[in-house]
């Protein structure tokens, strides 16, 4: 059993790295923030040699931590209302040397200078960029990057796991039905369904 756990632990960075374009070596990161709103912008930090040192993403009105390394040379690319990234291209040598974002409104933003191995990714029809993951060399640069794609529903919210969303909604409907049936029973005073974990 211990052997299986050890193998699973050792394999997990490899599995994560398989979804990373560019270089799969370095320290893994995943940018969390989708729960704060839709992706609204990105800030790319560049080195004097124009490779990608680090970046931040903006979800709603909140900026994430810096992934990779800060520099005084950075460029912001802010999305307009109803605008989403639908394609990302890039290139890499030891570090990412360029990133190009294309939006559904036809805007294109390029950071760095394309050199080295080229890559391109898109979520397919009716998909947009939700967040990113990747590998970085601490203090040096971003080495590789991966992309999480999702849909937009009628309310403008991100949907990238429809099966779980439907299951959660079904459970909530069942709880509502149970509460209606038990309307004459004493309420315990807990309002668990309305509480959200803000951690």
From Swiss-Prot:
Indicate which residues are glycosylated according to the record: 62
Q: In terms of domain of life, where is this protein from? A: Eukaryota
This entry carries the following GO cellular component terms, namely:
extracellular region
Q: Which InterPro entries match?
A: Jacalin-like_lectin_dom (IPR001229), Jacalin-like_lectin_dom_sf (IPR036404), PolyBind_ProtTraffic (IPR052321)
Q: Which residues form the signal peptide?
A: 1-18
Query: Region annotation Disordered: residue ranges?
Result: 159-199
Q: Jacalin-type lectin domain spans which residues? A: 19-151
Q: What does this protein do?
A: This protein seems to be functional equivalent to rat prostatic spermine-binding protein, which is involved in polyamine binding.
The entry's family comment says: To rat SBP.
Which protein are we looking at? Prostatic spermine-binding protein
Naturally occurring in which organism (per UniProt): Mus musculus
Annotated gene: Sbp
